[in-house]
């Protein structure tokens, strides 16, 4: 609550202090506040020998504001909460229940035509891939989630936009000790994370190079037994690259290399490499059939590219608008492996009005296997096994 009032004050203060000492204040420089948000509810069932029913809800109230005290520069802000709860039950028992209230976004931004600086709890993502993203460093978005909600990170992000369409990013993060993205190990407390990114035009597209440094705390790990580890900090360097081009069809490449400081006591992989190759195209059939294809490789071990363990995933997504408000889509993930090929299949229908959206999702997947990215997401897997889910979302 103290952070909320501090944020509002920091946002209002520049506008107030910049006003002339007169009784009349120009209306264009007055802060403008808007309250909106999203309310969602869902229910579903996972078919099994004993079916498991699920129900849940989420409320994301959001306060936004903007002010233009100096004529050219803009101050704006956003603060929101994530209020959510869910239940899972079978015929004769309560399988699970969760409930939580936490900050979702709390940030303030200063921006001009070429520069912006944003501070606070914010969403940070970049890259070209659509379904399986090697550059998912700071978020946890799941392509199967119709709402596309994800936790943010606390930090400072600056971006400068050059005249030739190049963009320079720089960031400093702090207070994000829990594992995020693909991380197996959380970040050491009171240790800042630093990084940057350059995006450059490249013919009919663009390319990007990204770097991130942090000090990981091996005691804060998703692996059981890590709390017994003695060291509290290990250096980690991360490099990323991506490019996308429109040459009639959309083409992209995205990859990431992560090197964690080696230690004899460490039982975790110290090298991780990921690669995504993808394409998309809209076929002129009926209202337009959109098709997306991706190849994704995930590998972790003591060396890059060889040894250790890994997975190859073939992903496809087809989408077709039945009308102005109805859409159907199919997603398929294939994981080839010796002796067994795993398939994950999702069929969804959506209807979108001005403020209300309805989603109906059917899925057939292994009950005990998840994609590499999905396996790292904390919480239950609501799309495991066979089942169906209905979701309503209202935006106001």
Language-model features, listed with the residues they occupy:
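Residues on the lipid-exposed face of transmembrane beta-strands in outer-membrane beta-barrel proteins
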Residues: 61-67, 105-110, 156-160, 196-200, ...
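Detector for outer-membrane/organellar transmembrane beta-barrel domains
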Residues: 244-335
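Transmembrane beta-strand segments of Gram-negative outer membrane beta-barrel proteins
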Residues: 23-48, 75-79, 166
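Outer membrane beta-barrel
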Residues: 66-168, 173, 200, 367
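Transmembrane beta-strands of outer-membrane beta-barrel pores
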Residues: 41-47, 65-67, 81-87, 112-114, ...
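Outer-membrane beta-barrel "beta-signal"
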Residues: 356, 364, 380-396
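Residues that define the transmembrane beta-barrel architecture of outer-membrane proteins
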Residues: 51-59, 99-104, 150-154, 190-194, ...
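Repeated loop/turn-to-beta-strand initiation elements of outer-membrane beta-barrel proteins
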Residues: 33, 71-77, 114-117, 165-168, ...
